[in-house]
Structures are given as structure tokens and as C-alpha cells.
Amino acid sequence: MKKIFAVAALLALSLPFRVAGQDPSAQLKDFTRLLQVADGLQLSIVHLNDKTVPVLFQPPTLYSIRAHAKEATMFYVQGMPQKDVNLDTSGFSVQQGGESFPSTPLNISHFEKGKVSKGDRIDGLLQLAKHIDVSKPFTVLHGKDSVEFKFSEDQVKAMTAPPAK
């Protein structure tokens, strides 16, 4: 767990990262969903995989996050409240095929239980204890709010880097 918190600290230093000559939002679009978690707060939830991690992170954080994302399903969470809100990060879970998987929130910036002021950027990670099957639809839940992820065959293929030659 200490390693994950060290990763989160390194992560704060590496954001935001831009790939030269490429539009990061276009690269993340297929793997991002918007979740309304409170009046005045919408969070971008990005599925972390071989396609999204290099867009969001730079070395050495990139290598650590990619390794963790290969061990268990992870999401990058970002948002900015339009007014003061109370955020409860303990309420995130994922459902797939009738099973519910709790998540562990990792704070990078303002992604912890409590008050978040208008305009404060929220950054964090959600980590599941295991991998879910990304070839099947799944839902990220926060209390009564939810958003569905359903990836195409091509998107699932893009999530895994080709083997090294």
C-alpha cells in the first residue's frame, strides 16, 4: 500500500502530461466516461490501460502506474467543482455481471472524503482488488449515480500493447 501512495505522490508531479503532436483528449475519448457525483461536480473517469497510461503519465510514474494497472483494474479520476461540494471517495464501486467490486481511492489532489472548494482540481485513482473482464460491459457506481463502460472489440485490442520484438 505504501508503494501505491508513493506512486500517487509521483503522479501529482507528472500531471498534466501532453504527448507532442497528439491530441490527448482524442486518445482518451474512447476510455473516458463522465459521472455526475454531486450537484456542481462531474468527474471524468478514465479506464487505465496501455493506451491511456502513456497519455496521462510520464516516466518514472508511467512505469509504476502501468504495472499496477496490469495487476488490477484501475481508473484515473479528475474533475473541478463548479461550487463547494462534499466528496465521499469511499462510495465508488464497479459492477459487472451481477458482481460488485469495491474500489480503493488513492488521493493525488483533493480526491479524499470531505469538502472540496469551487475551482479546486480533483485528481485521484480508483483501484480494484482484481481485474474485471473489459470485453464485457461494466458500471462504475458512486452512491446512486453510475456510468457504464462498454468497449468495442477494437478498443479492447488497443488496451494491450503489442508484445516486444
Question: Which residues does each PLM region occupy?
Answer:
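Conserved functional micro-motifs across diverse proteins
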Residues: 21-165
